């Protein structure tokens, strides 16, 4: 008997433990196929990714439970859903509102055509990629932050 097909789409530019939770929950439902957003798709709603598509693909291909990684060229799941006809689409429940809500609704409507379901995983509240991205940018670009870090390093080394 073949396992059920689970589709999960993401950018995977900055992965954190909340994403791993989603991968784990998805793999409990069946074979996980990841629709990896292209650089162009990410740039539609966010910034350009830190890592290029091929780099992100290698990372995701090596996550436990992932059986395949394919391109997702837009934020809409439509094209890949009709091609794959998965039993489930798994996503963090943060897409129930905001700019992603329309993509969730579209996915649910398409999945209903063959009895598929959207599975919303409770969002990991203590971490998100946007905050991590901001912190990375602050570390790399804010001179006052760099000076403060340097001062801390100098104080630490002078105490040693």
What do these predicted regions represent?
Residues 2, 73-155:
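Classical nucleotidyltransferase
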Residues 156-160:
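Conserved small/polar residues in nucleotide/adenosyl-binding loops
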Residues 40-45:
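A short acidic, helix-capping loop that chelates divalent metal ions and anchors anionic groups
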Residues 29, 57-75:
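Short acidic amphipathic segments
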Residues 2-36:
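N-terminal catalytic cores of NTP/NDP-binding nucleotidyl/phosphoryl-transfer enzymes
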Residues 30-31, 64, 85, 115:
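Residue-level detector of structured alpha->beta connecting loops
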Residues 16, 32, 60, 90, ...:
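Divalent metal-coordination and catalytic microenvironments
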Residues 11-13, 39, 94-96:
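Short glycine-rich anion-binding loops that position phosphate/pyrophosphate groups of nucleotides
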């Amino acid at each position: 008997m073949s396992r059920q097909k689970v589709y999960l789409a993401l950018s995977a530019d900055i992965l954190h433990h909340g994403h791993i939770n989603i991968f784990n929950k998805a793999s409990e439902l069946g074979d996980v196929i990841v629709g990896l957003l292209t650089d162009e798709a990410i740039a539609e709603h966010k910034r350009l990714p830190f890592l290029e598509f091929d780099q992100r693909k290698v990372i995701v291909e090596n996550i436990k439970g992932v059986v395949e990684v394919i391109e997702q060229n837009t934020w809409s799941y439509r094209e890949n859903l009709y091609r794959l006809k998965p039993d489930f689409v798994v996503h963090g429940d943060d897409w129930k509102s905001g700019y992603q809500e329309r993509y969730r609704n579209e996915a649910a409507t398409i999945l209903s055509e063959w009895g598929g379901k959207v599975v919303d995983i409770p969002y990991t509240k203590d971490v998100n990629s946007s905050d991590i991205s901001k912190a990375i940018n602050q570390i790399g670009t804010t001179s006052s932050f760099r000076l403060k870090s340097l001062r801390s390093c100098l104080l630490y080394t002078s105490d040693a």
